[in-house]
Amino acid sequence: MCIRDRYEALKTLALKSAKDFLALYESIPDKNAAAAPERKTFYGKVPCTANEMYEHTKNVNTYYFAEIAVEADHDGNIYECRKRGFESLESNPDFLQNTVRKGSYGEDWSLRKVLRRFIWHDRIHAKAMYRMAIKVFGAENVVNPFYF
């Protein structure tokens, strides 16, 4: 499989993941309900409601793309902003070089890493959102596009 095909496959998964995350979020009857009390870690407040989980997951769009020097935003829904981020990325003729860049906190980042991270990050927060939602609303009232 050539580099472009691998990129397109991972991009397709990252966009599907964003669509699935949005579908899960939109299916939750009360986006401000929580199944557990608020708590904090050394990272800060843990997202407890569907709205908090959604906003957190959507808003990393700018962070992940910035780690590979791509201008992006988190305006609109998670799918729309991620799609625009890929469009911005693809406007650079050398985007498939998979250049490794030193990102914030001294961490190495590449296009492949960003693609994998989108999928991983969506999944961990979708699982938390789904678990919270079925506790509060029941599995029959929430979609499960990730097949948890």
Put a short name on every predicted segment.
Residues 1-3:
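Short, small-residue-biased leader/transition segments that mark boundaries at the very start
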Residues 6-27, 73-104, 109-128:
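Acidic/histidine-rich alpha-helical segments that form the ligand environment
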Residues 31-79, 104-148:
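Short, contiguous alpha-helical
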